[in-house]
Amino acid sequence: MKRWEIIFAAVGLLFLALGVRWIHVAELPKQETWLDAGGCHTPITILEPPAGVQPAGSVVVLHGLSANRRLMMYLAEDFAGHGLRAFAIDLPGHGDSKDAFSFARAQRCATAAVESLIRSGTIDPKKTILLGHSMGGAIAIRMADRDPLAATIALSPAPMTMPQRMPANLLVFSAGADLDVLKRTAQDLSAAAGGARTASDDFAQQRAFDLQTVPYSTHTSLLSDHRVAHQSELWAMRALFPNIAADTLTLNLDLATYETFGNGRRRLAGAIFGLLGILALFPAAVALVAKFSGPAQIESPGTRPTATLLLTEGAACAMAAVLLLMLGVPLHFLHLYAGAYLASVLLIVGILLLLLNFGFAMEYATFNGKRCAAAAFLGFATILAIGAWLNWQLDDAWLNAPRWLRFAGLLPVAWIFAFTEEAVLGPPRHGKQRAARFAIFLSLRLEIFLACLLAYYLLASGQVLIVILFVYLALFSILQRLATDALRVRTGSATAAALFSAILAAWFISTVFPLT
């Protein structure tokens, strides 16, 4: 093991220890349970205010498309830390929910969950705030027709059919760098509400409205933006206590319980530090696994296509894939909303690109059981370690039984694409050659995304989720390539590296996209 790998491992352990420490300092009383209502089996996390703090009210938190309740924990815990009971739920097909997803079912299950909490006396509608992001924001707004609550907060709400009546005390956030269609939705809500109304009398009469544009923010960054959290909590308090001056409520929030008792801002930082710690441990883990698999074999590639030819082939294959998918999605049987489409694109691109470069690609098609076993072990260890940490703190990345079935179906598809990618990129080199190879990789992935983007805007594919997830797809692609190259350098095996890469890809798709 090299010296820098040991140093990285030591730093990783330090970050993990620091992350765990900060998380425990910031912990709030929490209960994980399930709610059976309206034919839905809904996972729910209940967060209580710090010990000794009497709840001032409740907040029900609804996530967006391809998200989950754990992704909403920053906002939920911030509300709980400032004196409100927080109820974060998983909508059908998301997170721990095993119910099939559809937009209508998501609306129905969210409504049933809130009504069940009201009937049981768990929440008081006169003291309850409904907060939703994206799809969850649209659901929260439309629920006003059935379940009027004290206030509604919508973060970048998705396009919707307007409700018959506007929710009481509605606050809408719009991200500065959001999609145009989402910005228009926010403006339409403002027009329907008649513009801003933020006086104390407006809150008392339950007709307050405001549209706040958050500069330097994206659709998903709103979920961890302290400005959004602070303004949301102030809005909730003004709705619950309309007779108290806004300046007084602001001061109370600044001095409130979560900072005093739990140092709540540290939880998110601790979760991120822990994740960085796991990533820093990865080079040492690769070195140990590679040592088990034996000495690296020397890869001697033959003639490869030039960068220009390869990128031309990649663009042509990506466009051919989205055009073919107009006839139907071959992997529809996976029942993953947008995930089946993305996997089908990767499968078609992988097959076409492999056929175009079949001769030299077969030079890499060597099988070594020991190296492939090591790659599989490293792949599963990686997704289990990262998945467990994310599932504990940041996101729902731990596969439940239905998602493991999707993972099994995705793995061979992902391997075809991953092997083709390893073959056309060739073995990792050093210096400028390695940087150029990485640039080609990014360009190939970008071509696939742009093809999906064109399919959405020009071919009416309906796959908006792939567009929304661009940042996550880009970040995953970069980390996937760095990790795969680290293994390939140490083993000299394209097939083993492809297996490792395929495990990561199958895990990502089966985790992120909703079940249908």
Q: What would you call each of these model-derived segments?
A:
Residues 13-17, 279-283, 415-419, 477:
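Alpha-helical transmembrane segments
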Residues 22-261:
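Soluble extramembrane regions of membrane proteins in the secretory/endomembrane system
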